[in-house]
Swiss-Prot record:
This is Probable thiopurine S-methyltransferase. It catalyses: S-adenosyl-L-methionine + a thiopurine = S-adenosyl-L-homocysteine + a thiopurine S-methylether. GO terms for cellular component: cytoplasm. PANTHER family: THIOPURINE S-METHYLTRANSFERASE. Disulfide bonds: none annotated. InterPro entries: SAM-dependent_MTases_sf, Thiopur_S-MeTfrase_Se/Te_detox, Thiopurine_S-MeTrfase, TPMT. It is found in: Cytoplasm.
């Protein structure tokens, strides 16, 4: 899967994964994690997610990472904010910043340890399921190396992949444990049947919520 795939989806406004309010699992479980206010939360492949506004509203610093410049700009447009624009130290990312939220526009795999040195929490709602198997391996290894022991949430989707091509891709519980369990401690918090999500395709996906601790 090449970057152009996602750029094209954003350019054509084919962004069915975008939610119009904060994710209910985030709202339900994040306050139970007891993550200190003022902590920095990384949101990989963040798009223009309103989850970032919700996290900032609770007193967190948010570091979103997003490939699409259009998505980065639209996030602040919907907030009616004019972001400050700068570059990171390596020059590989354009940083859009307003309030306590930064969105780094660039390739997630170009992040280095210095870029995320203040990050202590992670929120992944639609990141790992956006990626095909080979990229999921890279994603988990990359974040595991950069962020040794984060708190946070990972939300995944699982279904019969033979019935539909992703994204969103099916990621089983066993794969989540294999990908992330090497570097991080995971606890399954909830499984939810999402029977209406892909009803026309005859698929009955399961959504899983994991705690990082």
């Amino acid at each position: 899967m090449k970057p152009e795939f996602w750029q094209d989806r954003w350019n054509k406004d084919q962004i069915g994964w975008h939610q119009k309010s904060a994710n209910p699992h985030l709202v339900k479980y994040w306050p139970t994690l007891n993550i200190s206010q003022g902590s920095t939360v990384i949101v990989p492949l963040c798009g223009k997610s309103l989850d970032m506004r919700w996290l900032e509203g609770l007193g967190y610093n948010v570091l979103g990472v997003e490939l699409s410049e259009k998505a980065c700009k639209q996030y602040f447009d919907q907030m009616e904010l004019e972001p400050k624009v700068s570059k990171n130290a390596s020059g590989k990312f354009t940083i859009y910043e307003a309030g306590n939220t930064q969105i780094w526009c660039g390739d997630l795999f170009d992040l280095d340890a210095d870029d995320v040195k203040y990050v202590s929490a992670l929120y992944d709602r639609a990141s790992v399921i956006a990626l095909p198997p080979d990229m999921r391996e890279r994603y988990a290894a990359h974040l595991g190396a950069l962020i040794p022991d984060p708190q946070g949430l990972i939300i995944t989707l699982d279904y019969d992949q033979s019935k539909m091509n992703g994204p969103p891709h099916a990621v089983s519980d066993a794969e989540v444990q294999r990908l992330f369990g090497t570097n991080w401690k995971l606890t399954l918090l909830e499984e939810v049947d999402k029977k209406d999500m892909f009803k026309e395709e005859g698929i009955e996906p399961v959504e899983r919520v994991y705690k990082l601790n």
